[in-house]
UniProtKB/Swiss-Prot annotation:
Protein name per the record: Cytochrome P450 72C1
UniProt membrane topology term: Single-pass membrane protein
One Pfam family recorded for the sequence: p450
Outcome of gene disruption: No visible phenotype under normal growth condition, but increased length of dark-grown hypocotyls, reduced responsiveness of hypocotyls to light and increased responsiveness to brassinolide (BL).
Cofactor: heme
Compartments where located: Membrane
Amino acid sequence: MLEIITVRKVFLIGFLILILNWVWRAVNWVWLRPKRLEKYLKKQGFSGNSYRILMGDMRESNQMDQVAHSLPLPLDADFLPRMMPFLHHTVLKHGKKCFTWYGPYPNVIVMDPETLREIMSKHELFPKPKIGSHNHVFLSGLLNHEGPKWSKHRSILNPAFRIDNLKSILPAFNSSCKEMLEEWERLASAKGTMELDSWTHCHDLTRNMLARASFGDSYKDGIKIFEIQQEQIDLGLLAIRAVYIPGSKFLPTKFNRRLRETERDMRAMFKAMIETKEEEIKRGRGTDKNSDLLFSMLASNTKTIKEQGPDSGLSLDDLIDDCKAFYLAGQNVTSSLFVWTLVALSQHQDWQNKARDEISQAFGNNEPDFEGLSHLKVVTMILHEVLRLYSPAYFTCRITKQEVKLERFSLPEGVVVTIPMLLVHHDSDLWGDDVKEFKPERFANGVAGATKGRLSFLPFSSGPRTCIGQNFSMLQAKLFLAMVLQRFSVELSPSYTHAPFPAATTFPQHGAHLIIRKL
């Protein structure tokens, strides 16, 4: 009997210890740790709201988002209060050395070019945070990896994005652009002019361009995959705006079920496509047909495994995750660049004419070629200015793995560092009093001339983790603009509503209605 009582006491004590440990961890997570970090940050000279239990700044941020996103803007209005209302408000209230709260997690805002350079160059000390219940939607493959795993993936994927491979992909871009422009010509054939929502066309075009370039002859299957992934991205954006509750992704909700279904279906389709192309490689498919990215990625992976052993290559799951990451970045960034370039040139007819003159001198009525596109100076200036004003990626985040001592301050372990690229691109201290104006001439001497050597232009990030698809995206944009301006002029429709909106990238909330005229 005594032994039974003793066992019960031991069990009860153990149970109480577990409960107390859980309570301690919960109290530390929701209160003690945030207050400790707040004290640390204020000692380092940062300003921000005092921590409010569990919610932090999220309630105020969500309220400001709802108000800001409900109203359109005049064309000449500053759209930062609409795109990033709470962050913009915080910087105005507390200065550029400030912090906000995402639930119990402090977010340090960094806008100083020298500090940005430190953070971007020391990427191993500032990995991407894993805060949130649905990170896999936005952070997969190369976008998600750190350390040696990132280096391994980057090394294997790099050959697919080299200039010689991009040259072979250009015909795929050309075919997709032709299809869209032929549709425009049919629609405008009666009157020579028509109104359309350019956002829808740009979104569909970049999807088709990416599918053709990525999957070659299997591009129609690629389009189906991208449609599923777009649904997953839309679901993920809803999750981001909700309060993060640890473990919530495992709850049997309709939302979570649909996310799992899209993930399963997408991976199954990627798997089938990858296995088909791997068979082509085994059969010795010639390099003269090496005209799609997936084949190039798999060929590079196969070569690495042969030369360095099986552990040096990427698994099937790795390859699928890298394909997902490339679509997420490629589709959304490029479609955003396309549409805002059309909007900007519709507002600024003088620059539209300058671009058309340059394109005409380079190609006449012929199809644009790689060499000619690489020498388009005015077009490149325009694209850089659009990337500055309407940066597709409007912010990015890092987190400190340990206490980090930077030149101007120190950060404790576990602090999220938010880099608001859009705010940096609109900072008058860095770009001058004309920062809100569309002035491509600021890039006449390239990015280095425009930034005066400071790290203040970050549309594709910077440092070792600069976007692997930067040249890919710029090639798409140059070809798109050249082929459009060879055939059409564009202007804003009276029904155009100016409403930049923060989704996966900066996109027009109510579309981008333009009038196109055949030349």
